[in-house]
């Protein structure tokens, strides 16, 4: 399925709206996410996993297995540096994925894995993620079709034009992606 990440939840403060889509596919072992982004600037300062990738040109995927109290967050900048964890909330019971778990997430980016400061201009870039389903389904094996609560995001906190786009709306007064109560739903097949 192909989804548009086009919700500008805070238009007065953060009106920037790059064009962003994500293609979602899976098999019995992997979740495949392919993001395509077209926007006016790009930044990639963070090169290490578990660093502040959200400050860069970043795409994100948060998900929760229905009935579980934890959700997972997968955040990847445009050169493939990632943050990943299981958690109950923004700062509640956060369990970062280990280096071995992070290493199992396969990434392919249209930019090489080299840091660069913000560049202005029109840029098109992509990020492909292959996430092992056992990182998401820790306590149970998925049975297909399998429902999953999710949201997809595009952000760039430290750029000249910061933005915070989502697939599913977030009706809050200020940006916060760590809100599983506002996740939408997809079905893995």
Residue ranges of each PLM-predicted region?
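Structural preference for beta-rich elements and adjacent junctions enriched in aromatics
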Residues: 1-189
